[in-house]
């Protein structure tokens, strides 16, 4: 069995029958111009490490880049993504005149849930206020 993951002009190929990969690459090369970058290490914000037990996925570089982007690289980490039983209030705080920063930040954190499902509840709470976020919501998101 072979798997192809295609994103725009990038293709990741893998499968449990490694001898089929060169044949597939040769067939694709006959139709398209290809550049083989070797074993997969990084793809769409995911770090991929191959071990004897399989593939290990991580987003540590993506998370570091996000912290750098929002100027929080030296922030103290929290033990949990949000306080248990906490709920955000729609009208708490003043509405943001440009909600783009909040929406972008929540989108970036949402992407982290691929490898950090423990963030899902907190992200779901933040997503409820995408249309009219307040300054309090932005602080909580950070």
Q: Whereabouts are the PLM-identified features?
A:
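Long, low-complexity, charge-biased intrinsically disordered regions
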Residues: 1-142
């Amino acid at each position: 069995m072979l798997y192809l993951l295609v994103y725009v002009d990038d293709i990741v190929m893998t499968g449990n029958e490694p001898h089929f990969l060169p044949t597939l690459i040769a067939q694709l090369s006959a139709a398209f111009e290809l550049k083989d970058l070797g074993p997969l290490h990084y793809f769409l914000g995911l770090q991929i490490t191959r071990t004897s037990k399989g593939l290990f996925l991580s987003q540590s570089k993506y998370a570091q880049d996000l912290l750098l982007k929002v100027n929080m690289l030296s922030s103290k980490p929290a033990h949990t993504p949000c306080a248990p039983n906490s709920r955000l209030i729609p009208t708490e705080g003043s509405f943001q005149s440009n909600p783009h920063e909040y929406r972008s930040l929540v989108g970036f954190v949402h992407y982290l849930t691929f490898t950090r499902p423990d963030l899902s509840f907190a992200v779901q709470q933040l997503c409820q206020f995408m249309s009219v976020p307040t300054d309090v919501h932005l602080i909580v998101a950070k």
